[in-house]
Amino acid sequence: LKPGGTVVEATSGNTGVGLAMVAALKGYKCVFVMPDKISEEKRAMLRAYGARVVITPTGVEPDDPRSHYEVARKFVEITPGSFYTNQYHNPQNAKKHLETTGPEIWDQMEGKVDVFVAGAGTGGTISGVGRYLKSKNPNVKIVCADPFGSILHDLFYFKEIRNKPHSYLVE
């Protein structure tokens, strides 16, 4: 990413907000692609930082050309000077939580951590923090809270997707 370039991300909002703040400070343009189920408040927050927000339909498969993943990927292909942070497949996501968030939680709790609960999201927070906490105390329980309709339920209990994923509210 070079000065004046464009940061692109498929997001449900939280990563987008962080990227939008940094982009505004550094002078980058940013484009965030999100499903239509995301609240207007999150969209407005991204726009307040100068981001362009592209809305896609919720009820499409991830590899459908209309999905927020595919629209973001395509946008990068056709936009010179753009960079796709790709939070869902970027190994730096979990690595940074392993290096920063995990130690912060451990230190602030003075090592008295029994259970860590996080939403699944991209998996970066729960896997990075979980790895760190387990390295400090193998008995720490790591709990994933995910909404009804998520494919993770079937994968966890049956090691396969048995029910067709469907849309769920994120807020």
Language model features with spans:
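Glycine-rich phosphate/pyrophosphate-binding loop at beta-loop-alpha junctions
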Residues: 58-66, 90-171
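Hydrophobic beta-strand scaffold residues
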Residues: 30, 53, 83-84, 142
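Short glycine/proline- and acidic residue-enriched helix-loop micro-motifs
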Residues: 55, 83-92
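Helix-rich "cap/lid" substructures immediately adjacent to catalytic or cofactor-binding pockets
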Residues: 1-6
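A short helix-to-beta-strand connector/capping loop
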Residues: 50-51, 80-81, 138
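Phosphate/diphosphate-binding glycine-rich loops and adjacent basic-rich segments that engage nucleotide
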Residues: 74-82, 86
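Active-site-proximal loop->helix
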Residues: 8, 17-75, 148, 152-165
